[in-house]
Amino acid sequence: MRLTAKQVTWLKVCLHLAGLLPFLWLVWAINHGGLGADPVKDIQHFTGRTALKFLLATLLITPLARYAKQPLLIRTRRLLGLWCFAWATLHLTSYALLELGVNNLALLGKELITRPYLTLGIISWIILLALAFTSTQAMQRKLGKHWQQLHNFVYLVAILAPIHYLWSVKIISPQPLIYAGLAVLLLALRYKKSRSLFNRLRKQVHNKLSV
């Protein structure tokens, strides 16, 4: 049985709750001692993992809609992507304000150079910013065929974000490996589009180098 438009609306409500409740829990944990011995790192990892979860959920929607024959599921993809961007922004903000501090934000540029995993993270965030800004139907009409080309960069984020996570942890644990494995699986399900994106990037790099 296919989902109805009303059921998809209720599903969106549930997804909004899924995006909001972790934030409410985080606020509670900060104020009631629910974090570990290094609360700053806990906040950074929690916000980053939540962003990654929404990224993976966003990538899951298209193959799930196809294989389950639920075309209306596509309507939830933008919502999931926006929650991914929101949590990625919280992740970046927590690093800038809690790790560096308000008085040391000028060091962010130096940090990006000396810590390559931060470079991957900021590249991912910039891509997500562009995707969030152009996610409306009005922008889709304005960009035309270029809209899909731009939004295919989500597959690049799906590679960079897990690497950023793996690189940032001092001790390799199963959790970042699981996220990386899920990202690889979802990219495999979208093999044609991800291959098209990387072939185009390779050609652009080759053309610039040959100039």
From Swiss-Prot:
Protein function: Part of the MsrPQ system that repairs oxidized periplasmic proteins containing methionine sulfoxide residues (Met-O), using respiratory chain electrons. Thus protects these proteins from oxidative-stress damage caused by reactive species of oxygen and chlorine generated by the host defense mechanisms. MsrPQ is essential for the maintenance of envelope integrity under bleach stress, rescuing a wide series of structurally unrelated periplasmic proteins from methionine oxidation, including the primary periplasmic chaperone SurA and the lipoprotein Pal.
GO biological process: protein repair
Main location: membrane
Assigned protein family: Belongs to the MsrQ family.
Cofactor: FMN; heme b
Membrane topology: Multi-pass membrane protein
Keyword tags: Cell inner membrane, Cell membrane, Electron transport, Flavoprotein, FMN, Heme, Iron, Membrane, Metal-binding, Transmembrane, Transmembrane helix, Transport
HAMAP family xref list: MsrQ
UniProt subcellular location: Cell inner membrane
Cofactor: binding comment: Binds 1 FMN per subunit.
Molecular function as annotated in GO: electron transfer activity; FMN binding; heme binding; metal ion binding; oxidoreductase activity, acting on diphenols and related substances as donors
Known partners and oligomeric status: Heterodimer of a catalytic subunit (MsrP) and a heme-binding subunit (MsrQ).
Lineage of the species this protein comes from: Bacteria, Pseudomonadati, Pseudomonadota, Gammaproteobacteria, Enterobacterales
Encoding gene per record: msrQ
Designated name of the protein: Protein-methionine-sulfoxide reductase heme-binding subunit MsrQ
